[in-house]
């Protein structure tokens, strides 16, 4: 599943085609994706201008001139094919490089825009979805209600980590993946951040706050490296796992900077470390870490 940096890469790739343009025609190849499409979906979009395109956690949000917001989630294999006004074809977030003929049968929603662009949503597994909600109710809609703070920007800090994790016995990795606490973090970047912070993934989350609820040095460092890892991954265009490529057809490059993720049995890359990357399973997900750099405490 694409994580925050990959979704941000898709957002940046879609922005030139969508923002400022109106939907002139919406074609639906089927009435549902993971969930049924909203009632009168095409009619509610047609003629509306896209005022802005933002990201919340792993969701894309298009603010419309009608006062509604179009929420889009890529699921496991969702992708967008874009024909720009100048005729160039790009794919801002391409996970499955199949032949064009085989891929076309998975084109489910197509948006024709007033600027001449065309945006097509393709989803092999059909785990993605789209919804329309009043923009004023985004924070309380069923997709975002109860969602945690954003890991990029000013919300995430050592103080926030201590406040969110205080008293929790949950393993640190599981707490970081809990979207009710911090929204948008996924398996890849949590493994990488924990390694940079030299924290064992099974450390009780509550250990990052002292008895008075103040952040420990580890909490401050963890907040810092989470931002660093995500910022670097966005700059690299995300991580290519299987066949992910971004807007201009090139692949994301952050996988070349992985320190532990998917490196089981390989030497730890930390300077002076002679440890080997291990893999364990936590809550059904693979966790990669170095026992030397990240000792259990």
Swiss-Prot record:
A Pfam family reported for this protein in Swiss-Prot or TrEMBL: Fapy_DNA_glyco
Active site residues according to the UniProt entry: 2 (schiff-base intermediate with dna), 3 (proton donor), 58 (proton donor), 285 (proton donor)
Hydrolase among keywords: yes
Entry EC no(s): 3.2.2.23, 4.2.99.18
Keyword Iron (UniProt): no
Binding site for DNA: 106, 125, 168
Coiled-coil regions listed in the entry: none
InterPro entries: DNA_glyclase/AP_lyase_DNA-bd, Formamido-pyr_DNA_Glyclase, FPG_cat, MutM-like_N-ter, Ribosomal_uS13-like_H2TH, Znf_DNA_glyclase/AP_lyase, Znf_FPG/IleRS
Residue intervals of every FPG-type zinc finger in the record: 259-295
Any Gene Ontology biological process: base-excision repair
Top-level taxon of origin: Bacteria
SMART domains: Fapy_DNA_glyco, H2TH
Catalytic activity: Hydrolysis of DNA containing ring-opened 7-methylguanine residues, releasing 2,6-diamino-4-hydroxy-5-(N-methyl)formamidopyrimidine; 2'-deoxyribonucleotide-(2'-deoxyribose 5'-phosphate)-2'-deoxyribonucleotide-DNA = a 3'-end 2'-deoxyribonucleotide-(2,3-dehydro-2,3-deoxyribose 5'-phosphate)-DNA + a 5'-end 5'-phospho-2'-deoxyribonucleoside-DNA + H(+)
MF (Gene Ontology): 8-oxo-7,8-dihydroguanine DNA N-glycosylase activity; class I DNA-(apurinic or apyrimidinic site) endonuclease activity; damaged DNA binding; zinc ion binding
Keywords associated with the record: DNA damage, DNA repair, DNA-binding, Glycosidase, Hydrolase, Lyase, Metal-binding, Multifunctional enzyme, Zinc, Zinc-finger
Cofactor requirement: Zn(2+)
Role description: Involved in base excision repair of DNA damaged by oxidation or by mutagenic agents. Acts as a DNA glycosylase that recognizes and removes damaged bases. Has a preference for oxidized purines, such as 7,8-dihydro-8-oxoguanine (8-oxoG). Has AP (apurinic/apyrimidinic) lyase activity and introduces nicks in the DNA strand. Cleaves the DNA backbone by beta-delta elimination to generate a single-strand break at the site of the removed base with both 3'- and 5'-phosphates.
Family stated for the protein in its record: Belongs to the FPG family.
Subunit structure as annotated in this protein's UniProt entry: Monomer.
Name used for this protein in its record: Formamidopyrimidine-DNA glycosylase
Lineage, uppermost ranks: Bacteria, Pseudomonadati, Pseudomonadota, Alphaproteobacteria, Hyphomicrobiales
